[in-house]
């Protein structure tokens, strides 16, 4: 999947991400493309990309050093779904390599008291 601005509609991108989710053989080579989707204006695409990056980071943590800070930036989102997905993604990456998320470790605990239940559950 090669993402280029305005090349795909939201539904096409979501469908592509769904197909990519099932094709783990190409995950490692697709990390950069999925990361690029974090810059879209679509909440749905950003959320799916964050989720998939978490899964990819669990499998390929060695490829995630340059992406973790951008994922962590979503922890400050006003959108609960993006906070939830970022928290989940960091948790997945951290399970594979704690050192990657160590700079954010203390900040993660504030989400135990988040106003949104889904965010609190992702903290666990």
Where are these regions (language model features)?
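Alpha-helix N-cap/helix-start positions at coil->helix boundaries
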Residues: 7-11, 28, 43-44, 80-81, ...
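Alpha-solenoid HEAT/ARM repeat scaffold
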Residues: 10-17, 32, 47-50, 83-88, ...
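Helix-adjacent hinge/juxtasegments
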Residues: 78-102
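Structural signature of alpha-solenoid helical repeat scaffolds
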Residues: 41, 59, 78, 96, ...
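N-terminal "cap/leader" segments of large eukaryotic alpha-helical scaffolds
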Residues: 1-36
